[in-house]
C-alpha cells in the first residue's frame, strides 16, 4: 500500500520563514529531529518559528527499522558547546516553548542525561520564560539517569511508546514496552508536578483494540498527554506501511482518550510527538501544578 491518501497531503509553507529558521540552525550548527527524521510537518513548524532540537549528534546507537535517523555503533563524543548553542537558538527564535530530544546514546554511562541537564540550564539562563519539554530515550532503564534529568525541572517529560506490545520486536527491537511504562510511572513518582507525555504511531498492523489497550496502559501510569499519528515509510529500506488509518478513526481515539482522562490527546494522520507541542502552555494554565 504505497499511494498516500489525500488527507496526508501537506500545504506548501512560506519558504521565507522556513529559510530564516534553517539559517539560525545552520549558523549555530544544530540538528533538529524535524530534518533528521524527515518529519512531514517541518514546513508548518518552521513557518511558525518552532523546532525540536536533536542533541548529542545526528547519529543513533540503535537502528530501529521505522526511523530515518542515521545509525552509528560508536557516535562522536559529546560537544561541550552544544548546550550554549541550543540556548542561543531559543533566544534568537524567541521560543515560548522548546522541545529538546536526543538520539539514543547507549555508549554513554548515563545515556546522555547530563547533556540534557546542561541544555535545560542554558535555556533557563537566557530565556527563563520558555517552558521546556524533554523527549528522552529509555536510558536503558537507568533510573538514576532519569532522576538526574528530572532534577533539572523540565515542565514536560515525553517518552514515546511508539507501538503496541505485539509489534515491539519488529518495530522497536531494542526497546521494551514494560520499561517504557515504568519510565513514565517513575517520572510521575519522582516529580509529581511534572506533565508526562507519550506517543504512538499507527498503520503498522495494529488493531483498534490494541491501540485502546495501550491508551489504557498509559493512563494506568498517570500519563497526561498522548499523541497518535500515522506511520509513514521514510525510504524503501524502512518498514512498510501496513495501512493508512482514516481521520475518523483518529478522531475516535481522541474521544476515547479524553474519556480515559488524558489532559490532552492530539490524534490525527500528521500528528508527530512534538506537533503543536507549544499548546502545552495552555494546558498548564488550565491544569496548574505546584512544585
Curated annotation (Swiss-Prot):
Its EC number is 2.8.1.8. Residues 46-263 form the Radical SAM core domain. The keyword Lipid metabolism does not apply. Its main location: cytoplasm. GO terms for cellular component: cytoplasm. The keyword 4Fe-4S applies. InterPro entries: Aldolase_TIM, Elp3/MiaA/NifB-like_rSAM, Lipoyl_synth, rSAM. Its cofactor is [4Fe-4S] cluster. It is an enzyme of class 2 (transferase). Pathway: Protein modification; protein lipoylation via endogenous pathway; protein N(6)-(lipoyl)lysine from octanoyl-[acyl-carrier-protein]: step 2/2. Binds 2 [4Fe-4S] clusters per subunit. One cluster is coordinated with 3 cysteines and an exchangeable S-adenosyl-L-methionine. It catalyses: [[Fe-S] cluster scaffold protein carrying a second [4Fe-4S](2+) cluster] + N(6)-octanoyl-L-lysyl-[protein] + 2 oxidized [2Fe-2S]-[ferredoxin] + 2 S-adenosyl-L-methionine + 4 H(+) = [[Fe-S] cluster scaffold protein] + N(6)-[(R)-dihydrolipoyl]-L-lysyl-[protein] + 4 Fe(3+) + 2 hydrogen sulfide + 2 5'-deoxyadenosine + 2 L-methionine + 2 reduced [2Fe-2S]-[ferredoxin]. Pfam families: Radical_SAM. It is found in: Cytoplasm. Keywords: 4Fe-4S, Cytoplasm, Iron, Iron-sulfur, Metal-binding, S-adenosyl-L-methionine, Transferase. [4Fe-4S] cluster 1 binds at residues 34, 39, 45, 274. Gene3D superfamilies: Aldolase class I. SMART domains: Elp3 (SM00729). Belongs to the radical SAM superfamily. Lipoyl synthase family. HAMAP family: Lipoyl_synth (MF_00206). This is Lipoyl synthase 1.
Amino acid at each position: 500500500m504505497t499511494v498516500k491518501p489525500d488527507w496526508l497531503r501537506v500545504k506548501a509553507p512560506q519558504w521565507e520563514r522556513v529559510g530564516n529558521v534553517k539559517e539560525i540552525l545552520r549558523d549555530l550548527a544544530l540538528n533538529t529531529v524535524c530534518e533528521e527524521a524527515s518529519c512531514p510537518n517541518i514546513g508548518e513548524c518552521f513557518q511558525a518559528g518552532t523546532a525540536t532540537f536533536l542533541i548529542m549528534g545526528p547519529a543513533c546507537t540503535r537502528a530501529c527499522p521505522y526511523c530515518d535517523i542515521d545509525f552509528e555503533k560508536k557516535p562522536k563524543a559529546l560537544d561541550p558547546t552544544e548546550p550554549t548553542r541550543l540556548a542561543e537558538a531559543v533566544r534568537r527564535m524567541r521560543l515560548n516553548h522548546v522541545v529538546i530530544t536526543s538520539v539514543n546514546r547507549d555508549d554513554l554511562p548515563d545515556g546522555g542525561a547530563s547533556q540534557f541537564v546542561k541544555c535545560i540550564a542554558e535555556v533557563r539562563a537566557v530565556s527563563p520564560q520558555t517552558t521546556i519539554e524533554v523527549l528522552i530515550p529509555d536510558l536503558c532503564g537507568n533510573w538514576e539517569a532519569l532522576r538526574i534529568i528530572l532534577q533539572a525541572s523540565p515542565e514536560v517529560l515525553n517518552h514515546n511508546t511508539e507501538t503496541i506490545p505485539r509489534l515491539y520486536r519488529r518495530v522497536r527491537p531494542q526497546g521494551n514496552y514494560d520499561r517504557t511504562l515504568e519510565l513514565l510511572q517513575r517520572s510521575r513518582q519522582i516529580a509529581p508536578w511534572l506533565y508526562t507525555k507519550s506517543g504512538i504511531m499507527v498503520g503498522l498492523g495494529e488493531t483498534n483494540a490494541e491501540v485502546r489497550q495501550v491508551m489504557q496502559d498509559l493512563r494506568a501510569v498517570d500519563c497526561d498527554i498522548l499523541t497518535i499519528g500515522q506511520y509513514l515509510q521514510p525510504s524503501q529500506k524502512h518498514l512498510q506501511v501496513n495501512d493508512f488509518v482514516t481521520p475518523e478513526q483518529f478522531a475516535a481515539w481522541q474521544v476515547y482518550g479524553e474519556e480515559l482522562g488524558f489532559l490532552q490527546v492530539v490524534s490525527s494522520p500528521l500528528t508527530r510527538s512534538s506537533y503543536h507541542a507549544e499548546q502545552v502552555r495552555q494546558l498548564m494554565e488550565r491544569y496548574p501544578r505546584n512544585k
